[in-house]
Amino acid sequence: MAKFYMMGNYTAQGFQGFLKDPKTDRSKAAQTAADAVGAKMLSYTGLRGAYDFFVIAEGTFEQAAGIKMATEASGALCNITICEAISINDVAGNAVKIAAKYKAPGK
């Protein structure tokens, strides 16, 4: 399974939920979303800065994208960015193979 890093923001609607229940545990909601599609949530952290939360999960890209779609469609979250962990060495190895055969336009 791939590892995904997901960052996002709460909307005004999401923040209104916190005002109604300041002790709400959103990590449980994130866990429920991951469980619904067979993904594994590894951690949930609230943030100060450009993003309001950070989730680390394992699964497929389709599972991560489904979580994004459903949670943003709820109206409580927005701006979810999904980043997939990669091996930069594997990427570089592929780039070397491509560079040996690729020809730029006009060459």
What is each PLM-predicted segment?
Residues 1-107:
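A compositional/biophysical signature of low hydrophobicity enriched in polar/charged and small residues
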